[in-house]
Structure formats: C-alpha cells, structure tokens
Amino acid sequence: MMEGQQHGEQLKRGLKNRHIQLIALGGAIGTGLFLGSASVIQSAGPGIILGYAIAGFIAFLIMRQLGEMVVEEPVAGSFSHFAYKYWGSFAGFASGWNYWVLYVLVAMAELTAVGKYIQFWYPEIPTWVSAAVFFVVINAINLTNVKVFGEMEFWFAIIKVIAVVAMIIFGGWLLFSGNGGPQATVSNLWDQGGFLPHGFTGLVMMMAIIMFSFGGLELVGITAAEADNPEQSIPKATNQVIYRILIFYIGSLAVLLSLMPWTRVTADTSPFVLIFHELGDTFVANALNIVVLTAALSVYNSCVYCNSRMLFGLAQQGNAPKALASVDKRGVPVNTILVSALVTALCVLINYLAPESAFGLLMALVVSALVINWAMISLAHMKFRRAKQEQGVVTRFPALLYPLGNWICLLFMAAVLVIMLMTPGMAISVYLIPVWLIVLGIGYLFKEKTAKAVKAH
C-alpha cells in the first residue's frame, strides 16, 4: 500500500468476471463508432478499415502495458497509482487529475448526445432538459453500490453488442444473398477510386477522430480494485480487446462499405442508419435511436463510475482532499461521485448556453486529454518494468514488444497531436495542453505547500 492510504475505507470487490468483460467491451462501442465514422469515411474512403486497424493495434499495446501493471498491483486509481509510485509524485498527481478531467469531458459530450437523441422522438424537449434528467438518474444508480453499476453496464453493453452483431449479420446476408441490390458488392472496397481514394493523406488526417473511438478501453484498469479475481479477469478482458476491435470496428465497417459505394455516406447521418434503411423506415429509425441512446448512456454511466474511482485513488495518495477518501457502509465512494457530478452538471449549463459550439470543442478536448493519458500509461509502464527488472521480479502478464511497443505508442501520440494542429477546429485543444499542464503544476505546488504547512503544525 502507498503512504497516505491508511485513512478512508476500502472499495468493495463487487464486480464479477462478466461485468469486467462487458465494461471493457462497452467502453469501446460508443458515439465514436456510431456517429464519428461518417466523417472519416468521407475523408479516407474504405481506407478507414486500415485506420481502425492501426489505431486498434496501438490501443491494444497500451492496454497490455496497463494490464501488466494492474495484474501485479490491482488498486484504485489505476495508472495514476503507477505513475505516482514508479515515476514520481507530480506524474501521479498530473495523470490522475488529467484522467478525471478526461472523463468529465466525455461525460459532458455523452450527455449532450443523449439530449440530441431524445429530440428524435420529442423535438420540443430542449437538450439540456433530457441531459439533466439522465444526469440525475445515472448518478443516483451509481450511489447504490458497485454491483448495480456492473449490472446496468452489463445490459447496456449487451444491447450495443447485439446491435452491431445484428448489423454485421444482416449486412452480410444482404451482400451474399443478392437482396442488397446491384450496388452491394465487395468490390465497392476498391472500385470507387481505390482503397485509399484520397491517398494516405486522407486517412492520416482522420487518425485523431479514429482515436476518439478507442478512448474508454482503459476502463478495465480502473475496475481492477473492485474485481473479484483481477489476476484472471484482467488478462482475459485485455486479450479479448483485439478480437473485439476486429469484429466490431473492422467487421462492421467492411460490411457497411461493401453494401454501397462509400461516396454515398453523408457526414450528418450515421452510416449505420443508412445500412438498416433497407428494412423499412420507422422501425429501423426507432430501433437505431434506442441503440445510439443506449450507447451514449452506457458511456456516461462508465464515466460516473470512472471519475469517482479516480478521485478516490487521488485522495488516497494525498493528491485530493482527504474527505474524498471515504466510502459509505456499502463500499461506495459517495463524496467523489457527488463532486464529479457537480463538475459535470456545469456542462449541462454550458450546453444550455452554447449548444452549437460546445459539442465540437468537447470532442477535440477529449482527444487531447486522451493523448496525454495514453502517453503517460506508456511512460509509467517503462518505469514500472525497469523497477521490476531491478528487483528481479518476473511479471505475470508481460506487455507486448517492450520497450519497442512503448516507443511506437509514443510516436503515434505525437503524430496525432501534429495532425490535430493541422485540423481546423481541433488545433485549439492542442494549444490548451501546455496551459493545462501549467494549471496542474500550480495545483501540485499548492498541494505540496499545504502538505508542508500541515506537517509544520
């Protein structure tokens, strides 16, 4: 245990293996896949499949690096614990708070999406009203106990998975039975101007948006402290990520782009709506809206869980106020859930004041925070592995391609930042990174000063 972990109580280990597996899976199927893929298809054409394969490989390397650390030391606060222990107290402080802010931003974005999806049925309801209602409901559920969160996420994820699998099967049937019409042919993947119609540039420029789709995979690391059997469930969930990326992202996009020429995809429609259009309008439109609504709620649900656990871990390390390191008699960190909720509620206000511009900026900020997050996992892992080697410890679940894999990941992160600088509307979030790091530095110095003052008394 780290120093500063004596106070506060323990989180309950209430998550079963099936919960962990589906939390990992659900984290990867969100708004990014359902809606974000349209603009990528317009720019990269069928090359989007290659883009998801590359980003998926990087995500898998990062997951394995996190997995190796978590199996050795399953604690609350996930990788901020490793950054803190193996890299230094500022790294722990910065990575923990960055992760917390990342998921507050994702929570804001998903709540905004929920408001938009509800308007599909009830256009007269303003987005902030639906956002506020679901905000209250999901926070209330998370305040009960971790088993309820696990169950809810389990069923949310099942709905999303069934929808994607049904789409792949139905699309495959249309393709191979001839019922998809004359335009449905596998040759659509290379006939319309080639596999990479706009060359590699078209694909490379979209890597930041593709990366947004993979944010959330690292949720598995956060669940470790509440998993019944982390040394079995974490490696299993981590290794299955690769099949899931292949099936859900690459499989669904390959079917989708074979069914009709990619040139017919429009940026403002979910490509998944287009494919199911064949079934008849109203049924499909409603069914799909339920699925995308579930996807957004599921990711928001995970955000509430994640934020509260990260803040709890920070408080245990002494990097957040002590009051946040307590749990109630059911093992729920009530204070951290309420603090995270309070900050997220602020974004309901932002959406109320500036509904148009808020969403795009939130997305770009999410990718920037995600880049910092993944880079820190990779760097902390290198420090962790070095420390273990010096102690002569052989880890039970070693990461792939160490240390080359870590350098590949870091190069990829740097490339994503360069791409964002060249993308209109995204550059601002890259310029905000140094500002954010300065804010973290000031926060850290304030914390150190306060700690010294307390010790002096």
Curated annotation (Swiss-Prot):
Localisation: Cell inner membrane
Periplasmic compartment segments: 40-42, 120-124, 169-192, 261-279, 352-359, 424-426
Regulation: Strong, mutual inhibition of uptake by tyrosine, phenylalanine, and tryptophan. Transport is also inhibited by the aromatic analogs p-fluorophenylalanine, beta-2-thienylalanine and 5-methyltryptophan.
One record GO biological process: tryptophan transport
InterPro entries tied to this protein: AA-permease/SLC12A_dom (IPR004841), Amino_acid_permease_CS (IPR004840)
PROSITE patterns from the UniProt entry: AMINO_ACID_PERMEASE_1
Transmembrane region(s): 19-39, 43-63, 99-119, 125-145, 148-168, 193-213, 240-260, 280-300, 331-351, 360-380, 403-423, 427-447
Gene ablation phenotype (knockout): Mutants show reduced aromatic amino acids transport and are resistant to p-fluorophenylalanine, beta-2-thienylalanine and 5-methyltryptophan.
Stretches assigned to the Cytoplasmic side: 1-18, 64-98, 146-147, 214-239, 301-330, 381-402, 448-457
Induction: Contains three promoters, P1, P2 and P3. Repressed by the regulatory protein TyrR, which binds to TyrR boxes. In the absence of TyrR, the RNA polymerase (RNAP) has a higher affinity for P1 than for P2 and P3 and occupies the P1 promoter region. When TyrR and its cofactors are present, TyrR inhibits the binding of RNA polymerase to the P1 promoter by recruiting RNA polymerase to the P3 promoter. P1 is not repressed by TyrR alone but is repressed in the presence of phenylalanine, tyrosine or tryptophan.
UniProt-listed Pfam families: AA_permease
A cellular component term, taken from the record's GO annotations: plasma membrane
Site residues (Key residue for tryptophan transport), renumbered to this chain: 103
PANTHER family: AROMATIC AMINO ACID TRANSPORT PROTEIN AROP (PTHR43495:SF4), GABA PERMEASE (PTHR43495)
Additional information: The general aromatic transport system is not essential for the supply of external aromatic amino acids to protein synthesis.
Entry protein name: Aromatic amino acid transport protein AroP
Source species of the chain: Escherichia coli (strain K12)
Gene: aroP
